[in-house]
Amino acid sequence: MSLPVLQGTGFQFRRILSFFPQDISLAFTYGSGVFRQAGSSHNDVRNKMLDFVFAVDDPVTWHTMNIIQNRSHYSFLKFLGPKHITAVQNNYGAGVYYNTLVPCDGRLIKYGVVSTETLLQDLLHWRTLYIAGRLHKPVKILTQRDDGRLKSALTSNLKSALNAAFLMLPESFSEEELYLQIAGLSYAGDFRMIIGEDKDKVLNIVKPNVPHFQKLYAAILLDCPLAVYKAQQGRVEVDKSPEGQYQQLMALPKKLQQNITALVDPPGKNRDVEEILLQVAQDPDCSSVIQQALYGIVRSSSLSQSAKGIVTAGVKKSVQYSSKKLYKMLRSLRRGKS
């Protein structure tokens, strides 16, 4: 999954990683500080905050070591100790603990810590679609443990993204339309897209980075029995028959299937999941059902994770971070009017 990124940035990412405890199963960096987005110049990219995620097997031990090495990164929660920090990480929001606006090696960074098990559950089942959603889009993998379960879960997450996108697209579409749909999956229902994000965020992510998306999805598309991938023309065709859509629905992550079931099945009926998904496969409004089910996952996790961020970052940093996001939103609105 490692992808080429902006020229000359790989060494700095590895240097930054060296400032942290090294017992990490997966570390990656992502976002506009790594992959150039539409409307950004080279200087803009150099000045952007860098975003990282670290997956660790034992968060208590990792936070213990990180507080020793990087005590200033933490809010007042450091005084409660690593067990309380881990409890906040695991029991609230999307299971991720973020330290933000951290000066490191001449750059400002934000990094999230997630347990390896929480990451696996999100990749496989889309419990929150928080980290799984980030991994639908190009990222720069900095370290990845040789672990068959993790490798399989990362691939499963990409296949799930394709199936969900297929169900919301027409029978024939361009590669760019596919990647726009995939990139938007984890923003469906995210309240930050209403308040605090660039209104053209999904378009800006995809437009300059189609080759990076191709590196993630081309091999899976070629191997997909329900799709015809015409790489030379940049087109994709999918099976939109009820049988084809049923297979795609059955391959969706468990949490998304549960949300679909809750939307479609009247209370008290208690039908089998297979029966409900067969009904959805024949529904002309199948795509809107998928969209609503995604909203339910993302809305809940984005709200609770953002609320947790006020505690983990502290009030001062939360205000600074929110101000930056609001500035981006207002700038995109001004661009839209011009």
UniProtKB/Swiss-Prot annotation:
Gene Ontology CC entries for this record:
mitochondrial inner membrane; mitochondrion
Q: In which pathway does it act?
A: Phospholipid metabolism; CDP-diacylglycerol biosynthesis; CDP-diacylglycerol from sn-glycerol 3-phosphate: step 3/3
Q: Does the keyword Lipid metabolism apply?
A: yes
GO molecular-function annotation terms? phosphatidate cytidylyltransferase activity
For this protein, the Enzyme Commission number is: 2.7.7.41
Query: What's the protein's topology in the membrane?
Result: Peripheral membrane protein
Catalyzed reaction equations: a 1,2-diacyl-sn-glycero-3-phosphate + CTP + H(+) = a CDP-1,2-diacyl-sn-glycerol + diphosphate
Keywords recorded for this protein, A-Z: Lipid biosynthesis, Lipid metabolism, Magnesium, Membrane, Mitochondrion, Mitochondrion inner membrane, Nucleotidyltransferase, Phospholipid biosynthesis, Phospholipid metabolism, Transferase
Which prosthetic group or cofactor does it need?
Answer: Mg(2+)
Catalytic class of the enzyme: transferase
Entries under InterPro entries matching the protein: Tam41 (IPR015222)
- Role this protein plays: Catalyzes the conversion of phosphatidic acid (PA) to CDP-diacylglycerol (CDP-DAG), an essential intermediate in the synthesis of phosphatidylglycerol, cardiolipin and phosphatidylinositol.
Question: What name does the UniProt record give this protein?
Answer: Phosphatidate cytidylyltransferase, mitochondrial
Q: Which organism is it from?
A: Xenopus laevis (African clawed frog)
Q: Which gene encodes it?
A: tamm41
